[in-house]
Amino acid sequence: MQASRLGWSSYGDTQYVAHVLRYYPYGRAFTAGGNQAIVEVALTQVGNQGGQPYWSWYGFDSRVEWCACFVSWCADQCGYIESGLVPKFAGCVDGANWFKSHNQWHDRNYEPKAGDIIFFDWGGDGITDHVGIVEKCENGTVYTVEGNSGDACKQRTYAVGSSSIYGYGIPAY
């Protein structure tokens, strides 16, 4: 065998997989595309405290309200910002307005799909003030992954049509 003549115990790079995967976000290739990819990225971030990777990626030098930075960061990891599927936004109002202006918007009574962007109105004043990513919707319950939920990335649940839901941005995956 050529390998043993050259003094090798095997052919090729024994660390090939690790060396290739370093070029993928989080060291792994996505198992799904489209709307599921952003959910997979978001789920890898559950437990992050303080949001530093997201607001610093966006360009801020110090901590800001970072829920929108988190959503944008997740979208960027999937190539969705570069491809124009999801806007890069640091303010919830800007993100909601982008989806509305592109006719990719549904109100709170819509039954969302995985990968939809969920906007909230905690104050009940008709202005969105928080945003997350829909993980799934089952039996009238919306499951989300949100950044800056108590200053951490967390999974949360809401009833479809909840008064705290402002609406949904629907990326054209």
Question: How would you describe each model-predicted region?
Answer:
Residues 1, 20, 41-46, 72, ...:
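Short, functionally critical alpha-helical segments immediately adjacent to catalytic or ligand/cofactor-binding
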Residues 1-40, 162-173:
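Non-catalytic cell-wall polysaccharide-engagement segments
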Residues 2-10, 48-52, 80-81, 127:
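Secretory-pathway/luminal and periplasmic proteins that interact with or process carbohydrate-rich
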Residues 7-11, 55-65, 105-109:
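A glycine-rich, coil/turn loop motif that links secondary-structure elements
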Residues 14-17, 64, 68, 112:
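Short alpha-helical patches at coil-to-helix transitions and adjacent helical residues
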Residues 28-83:
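N-terminal capping segments
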Residues 81-151:
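...with weaker cross-activation on analogous glycine-rich loops/strands in unrelated enzymes
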Residues 139-173:
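Active-site signature of cysteine proteases
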